[in-house]
Structure formats: structure tokens, C-alpha cells
């Protein structure tokens, strides 16, 4: 039976709409983790498809400066993985949450305990950017009988056969990495990016979402045309932190029709 995240995103895709997933850093709020529910409900009210929730880490190798600084602010507020898990247990939302964490915080907490403790929460997906596919067995057995999907990240520099290997049996969605480098580096796209996205889309049997560097209306239109939707991180994190209006951008992303 498909996992909830797969079903919800497939339903949006079947309705001919673009999937939109904003990223937020847990604890990057003037109230720390006490403000997490407020941010989630703000995004839920705007109609987002799912929400990616980051766990702060002191050595975030895939994060650009905006998200790295958000993580440092969160850590300064005292955010810990344990405290986040306890907070997530109290949050009620109809929107699936996807945890984005490096492997070290997960390892320190204990993978089995982490998965068990999130069983009755809105968390339906898990992204671990520094976990190689060959080591997915460190995590996958603990997810097998749960409603949490392990989301594969696929670089578009990867050959088609390797792409097929990375996405085989995947649930939730495929995270297509649009740029070479860290998050937030908008516009640094390879010339044949659209072709590679279309190729990945053809071999995937679950939604393909494009992330890393997506930040403009033009990006939304471009990537919705060749994939099933987009993930936007740095632009959202910066706007929330600085109190900038972001509602119109999100509404445009949510309303995108295929």
C-alpha cells in the first residue's frame, strides 16, 4: 500500500496542479520551537502541498549561507532533535511534513527511536542529504513498516542507469537537485538541465520535485513544466526571518496549473 506522502502528492499531480513544498528551519523563530506550529499553520493556510522541516546541524554541508545561518539561529534558541520531536508530537496539521536532517543528529538520537517517536505525528517523509544510497540500509529497515518515506536525492549529473538505481522502490517523491553545489545558488543551472529533468521524470513512477536554487516566478514556471513541482528553501527562510511578505509568491506556486 502506498505511503501517505505518495498518495497525497500523486493526487495533486492527478489534478493537474504543480506540487509546492516550502522548506523551513525548525526553531528559526523568535519563539524558537514554540513558533513552529505557527509557521506550519501559516503555510498550511496558503495551501502548500507538504512542508520540509529542517533539523539544525553545526556542519550542514549541503546548505547555502541563508539556511546555514538559520540553523545557527535555531541552535542559539536551544533547538535539539529531542525537543523538536516532542514539539512535533503536539502539532496537528493535515499537511504532510518531511524532515530534512543530516545523518549525525539522526545517529545520535538513534534511528529506530527517531522513527518510533515520530510514528504518531504528521511526519510522512525523511530526507538525509549526506547518506549515500549504498548506506540507505542504515535507515530503510526501520521505515519499512511505517508511513514515513525515505526521499532519494538525485543529482542531474547522474547517468540514467544510476538514476534508475537511486529511485527504485522509492516512496513519497524524487528530489531532483537542480544545481551543482549548495542550496540557494539560484541561476547556476547547466545548459541541458531541462532535458535531464524530463528524462528523470520519464523513468520515475512517483512525483519528481526540483529543488536547490529555485527562487523566482520564472523558476516556478520552468521547473513545473519539466517536473511535477518545486521545493523552495532559501527564499522562504529568508522572508520568514526578515518579516518580508512571501504570501503572493506561495499563492502563485500553489495555484500553478499544468
UniProtKB/Swiss-Prot annotation:
Pathway: Amino-acid biosynthesis; L-tryptophan biosynthesis; L-tryptophan from chorismate: step 5/5
EC identifiers of the protein: 4.2.1.20
Active site: 52, 63
MF (Gene Ontology): tryptophan synthase activity
SUPFAM superfamilies per UniProt: Ribulose-phoshate binding barrel
Chemical reaction(s) catalysed: (1S,2R)-1-C-(indol-3-yl)glycerol 3-phosphate + L-serine = D-glyceraldehyde 3-phosphate + L-tryptophan + H2O
GO CC annotations, alphabetized: cytosol
NCBIfam families listed in its UniProt record: trpA (TIGR00262)
Function: The alpha subunit is responsible for the aldol cleavage of indoleglycerol phosphate to indole and glyceraldehyde 3-phosphate.
Family to which the UniProt record says this protein belongs: Belongs to the TrpA family.
This protein's name: Tryptophan synthase alpha chain
